[in-house]
């Protein structure tokens, strides 16, 4: 009996110390996020931070000279502030521009001629940012010879796992951003906070996001207009590509006080947010839409009403054509990942009948 009691007491003495040996360092703070759901950041004493993205990415962000928090020794490390970044995600560069961090970017997967944002095109033409190959075929020799502190990919790289493995094999940390999975348009913009933390520009990132959030809140307070909107483009084969209910463009139309005119679509068979339907189906659903918005990014802009009507003889019978409510997107709109709040504000102006003919993201087709 006495021996058993001694054994129990010994275990009670040893257990706390064993627990302490395996204890993880205490989290001292967490990045405040209002809309983004696909990443989180925990802070630790000494400046280290733990970054989680999606369900299977876990990193330790480690400033120079900072100690590794207990329990996080096994995590892959990203030195911060990161320099010489390779942005293989086309949605990221605009966010770097808005927080004045292009000087931390060394490489892009988009060529100069394919940029519609003047500042990014100029940065590449002036060779402040270099083209390092598209995401699926990076220029490994260039990255090795000039150095690369971090590779930022989008989820397309998941279809090319060998590329990610090769980059990591060469010693480059690879981060896959999931901003396109954010359910709220402002969630996409809030990824600027992560990029700010990675580059030492968090105050600038937070200030930009706060301005965008205020712009959004101003538009959100407006009453629903009841106006229906068809956002589309016509393919070279004559089909019409429209947005599904779950797509973020449809979500922005709704947040702006409008309603999508396209509601009768087949059940989704994949994760794509678009659907190509026959012109006859589009005509039946969008003929009486209050507003038509043509997506110039996919197949080119329409400079005037004559060019728009030349796309299909059926378009002349649409209500929005008769009322002068046909709009076209500016070519840079989809590269401006920072502009969600501005897009919502301009969409609200369009559906409420208060828009000028020329906006930053749209223009009226006349």
Model-predicted regions and their roles:
Residues 1-8:
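Positively charged n-region of N-terminal signal peptides that target proteins for export
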Residues 14-20:
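C-terminal segment of classical bacterial N-terminal signal peptides
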Residues 20-93, 204-232, 355-366:
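Bacterial Sec-exported substrate-binding components of ABC uptake systems
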Residues 49-53, 59-144, 150-156:
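A short, structured surface patch at a secondary-structure boundary
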């Amino acid at each position: 009996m006495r021996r058993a009691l001694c054994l129990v007491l010994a275990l009670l003495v040893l257990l706390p110390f064993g627990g302490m040996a395996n204890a993880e360092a205490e989290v001292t703070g967490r990045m405040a996020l209002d809309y983004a759901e696909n990443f989180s950041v925990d802070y630790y004493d000494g400046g280290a931070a733990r970054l989680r993205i999606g369900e299977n990415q876990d990193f330790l962000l480690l400033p120079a000279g900072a100690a590794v928090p207990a329990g996080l020794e096994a995590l892959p490390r990203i030195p911060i502030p990161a320099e010489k970044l390779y942005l293989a995600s086309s949605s990221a560069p605009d966010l770097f521009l808005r927080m004045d961090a292009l000087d931390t970017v060394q490489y892009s997967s988009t060529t100069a001629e394919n940029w519609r944002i003047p500042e990014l095109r100029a940065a590449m033409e002036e060779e402040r940012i270099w083209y390092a190959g598209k995401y699926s075929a990076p220029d490994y020799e260039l990255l090795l010879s000039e150095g690369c502190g971090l590779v930022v990919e989008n989820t397309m790289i998941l279809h090319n796992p060998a590329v990610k493995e090769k980059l990591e094999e060469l010693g480059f940390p690879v981060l896959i951003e999931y901003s396109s999975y954010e359910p709220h348009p402002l969630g996409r913009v809030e990824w600027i906070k992560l990029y700010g933390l990675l580059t030492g520009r968090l105050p600038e990132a937070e200030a930009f996001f706060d301005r965008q959030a205020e712009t959004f809140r101003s538009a959100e307070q407006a009453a629903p207009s009841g106006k229906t909107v068809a956002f589309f483009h016509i393919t070279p084969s004559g089909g019409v590509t429209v947005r599904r209910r779950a797509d973020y463009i449809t979500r922005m139309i709704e947040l702006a006080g409008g309603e999508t005119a396209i509601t009768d679509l087949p059940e989704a068979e994949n994760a794509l947010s678009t659907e190509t339907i026959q012109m006859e189906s589009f005509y039946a659903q969008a003929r009486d839409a209050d507003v038509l918005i043509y997506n110039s990014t996919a197949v080119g802009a329409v400079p005037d009403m004559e060019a728009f009507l030349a796309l299909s003889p059926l378009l002349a019978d649409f209500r929005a054509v008769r009322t002068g409510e046909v709009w076209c997107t500016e070519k840079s709109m989809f590269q401006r990942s920072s502009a969600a709040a501005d897009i919502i504000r301009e969409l609200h102006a369009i559906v409420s009948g208060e828009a000028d003919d020329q906006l930053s993201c749209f223009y009226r087709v006349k």
